[in-house]
A protein has these predicted regions:
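Active-site PLP attachment segment
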Residues: 222-224, 232-274
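Walker B catalytic acidic pair
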Residues: 218-219
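Active-site donor-binding loop signature of nucleotide-sugar glycosyltransferases
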Residues: 37, 159, 254
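Conserved core of the PLP fold type I
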Residues: 67-211, 222-244
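Core-facing hydrophobic residues within beta-strands of well-ordered domains
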Residues: 30-32, 178, 249
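N-terminal "arm"/small-domain region of PLP-dependent enzymes with the aminotransferase-like
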Residues: 2-80, 86-87
């Protein structure tokens, strides 16, 4: 079948008629379907049920350094959680802040802080006039919705088999109003692309005109391999350090597709200056 963009108008009308009939037939069945995305099936949830037995009235609520987790916790997370999530992201433990169960909430909070307070002592984005944000497409609509919510102008960057088109990215960041880019570097939806080594190195070497430009590196699927041999992603934080450019990356991950999505852990990792 030819792509819709290559078909004549009459053929498109005929196809629309067929699809409309199919849609009407589906509606007549009055199905109640759960169309939510990224939702583990009951069989996967059953794999982690034993986690519910790890904490009881006698054991399991004291951390290795004696913090009672039944009470208020630590601002940046308990040591065990920081160690686990640091290992997942391939970063030092002291760069990690553990949040709630939603990495998307942490991304929202980071962008909100950038607009309201600025980045690393810089001028708040809200006071800088027009703000642009790079959005690799196809990509994650909820990322884009965050920056759109705060009034940023979304600028599309086409994806390639290597990741975002870096020639385009490098050209756009010459504009000081471009403040960041959204990235899902491993198994990026919907194409499942993992960024190439060259793409990661070019991100690490970026010298944007805006000092407060940040790569929002959502490494959501960093350990989510479907097969015994998974893809390998070059470590952006380490590559950026080689370029003395580690401030440029803000990394996120979570356990939402590993254990129970509603009660997992999310984390942000960034340089000490950030």
């Amino acid at each position: 079948m030819k792509a819709f963009s290559e078909q004549p108008k009459e053929a498109l009308k005929a196809q629309l008629s067929v699809l409309s009939e199919q849609y009407t037939a589906y509606k007549a069945k009055k199905l109640s379907l759960d169309m939510s995305r990224g939702k583990p099936c009951p069989e996967q949830l059953a794999l982690t049920l034993r986690m519910l037995d790890c904490v009881n009235e006698k054991d399991g609520y004291l951390t290795e350094n004696g913090v009672d987790t039944r009470n208020y916790g630590l601002l940046d997370g308990i040591p065990e959680a920081k160690r686990l999530l640091a290992a997942m992201m391939g970063v030092p433990e002291d760069t990690v802040i553990v949040g709630g169960n939603s990495s998307l909430n942490m991304m929202f909070d980071y962008i909100a802080g950038a607009f309201a307070k600025g980045v690393c002592g810089g001028k708040p984005w809200l006071m800088q006039g027009e703000v642009k944000f790079l959005c690799p497409v196809p990509g994650y609509d909820r990322h884009f919705a965050i920056t759109e919510f705060f009034g940023a102008r979304l600028v599309c960057v086409l994806m390639t088999e290597e990741g975002p088109d870096m020639d385009v990215v490098e050209e756009y960041v010459k504009d000081p109003t471009v403040k960041g880019i959204w990235c899902v570097p491993m198994y990026s939806n919907p194409d499942g692309i993992t960024y190439s080594d060259e793409t990661v190195r070019r991100f690490a070497a970026l010298r944007p005109a805006a000092e407060d430009f940040r790569i929002m590196w959502d490494n959501a699927y960093c350990v989510h391999h479907l097969y015994d041999t998974g893809d390998r992603l070059l470590n952006l934080y380490e590559e950026a350090k080689k370029q003395h450019n580690e401030d440029i990356v803000i990394q996120f991950t979570s356990t939402s597709k590993i254990s129970f999505p509603g009660s997992g852990m999310a984390a942000l990792a960034a340089s000490p200056r950030n």
